[in-house]
Amino acid sequence: MIRRVRVTVRVSRACRPHHVRIFVAKIVQALCRASASINQGTPFQVLLIVRKKRHRGRSGHDDGQCTPGSNPVAVRGGTQHPRPDNPHPASPRRCPGGLPGHSDAAPSGRGAAGCQGLLGSPACGPRRGTRTPPRGRIPARGGEGRLNDTVQEAQ
């Protein structure tokens, strides 16, 4: 059985006032009780129809959001670092010489860092064993601690 349903939709948007749309939708509905589980999909069918009819003329605007202007959002094609005070050049993240601003970095591709499952970029932090100790503490490594002990014994 085809059932005609009157659907009233109140569309709320971030940058425009609410507006109401009313239309008639045709929904196929099961007649027998054995296939009553098909009838539970009726709200889902209504939502699909509402989404299709909401912005029929405009493609890509089916989630209720809108851009500040009337033009669709342009593809990001500007430089990666638009600020003038940024020390890194405006180049792709990985270029043939490695990471921008790091001449001793691994060449493009995953390299040894990729084999370990790490990104290998400076954002991951310094490599193991290169961190500076916290202020006011002497690092507890083998050679440095013994050096301080021998200096105290000699005095």
Swiss-Prot record:
Chain intervals for the UniProt region annotation (Interaction with CDK5RAP3 and MDM2): 1-59
Spans through the membrane: none
One GO cellular component term noted in the UniProt record for this chain: nucleolus
Any GO BP: protein K63-linked ubiquitination
Organ and tissue specificity: Ubiquitously expressed. In the testis, expressed in both somatic and germ cells. Not detected in premeiotic spermatogonia but expressed in both meiotic and postmeiotic cells. In primary tumors, low levels detected in melanocytic hyperplasias. Higher levels found in non-metastatic and metastatic melanomas.
Keywords, alphabetical: Apoptosis, Cell cycle, DNA-binding, Nucleus, rRNA processing, Transcription, Transcription regulation, Tumor suppressor, Ubl conjugation, Ubl conjugation pathway
Database matches in InterPro entries: Tumor_suppres_ARF
Record text on subunit structure and interactions: Does not interact with cyclins, CDK1, CDK2, CDK4, CDK5 or CDK6. Binds to BCL6, E2F1, HUWE1, MDM2, MYC, NPM1/B23, TOP1/TOPOI and UBE2I/UBC9. Interacts with TBRG1 and COMMD1. Interacts with CDKN2AIP and E4F1. Interacts with CDK5RAP3 and MDM2; form a ternary complex involved in regulation of p53/TP53. Interacts with NOP53; the interaction is direct and promotes ARF nucleoplasmic relocalization and ubiquitin-mediated proteasomal degradation. Interacts with TTF1 (via the N-terminal region (NRD) and a C-terminal region); the interaction is direct and inhibits the nucleolar localization of TTF1.
Function: Capable of inducing cell cycle arrest in G1 and G2 phases. Acts as a tumor suppressor. Binds to MDM2 and blocks its nucleocytoplasmic shuttling by sequestering it in the nucleolus. This inhibits the oncogenic action of MDM2 by blocking MDM2-induced degradation of p53 and enhancing p53-dependent transactivation and apoptosis. Also induces G2 arrest and apoptosis in a p53-independent manner by preventing the activation of cyclin B1/CDC2 complexes. Binds to BCL6 and down-regulates BCL6-induced transcriptional repression.
Protein name per its UniProtKB record: Tumor suppressor ARF
Organism, scientific name: Monodelphis domestica (Gray short-tailed opossum)
Higher taxonomy: Eukaryota, Metazoa, Chordata, Craniata, Vertebrata
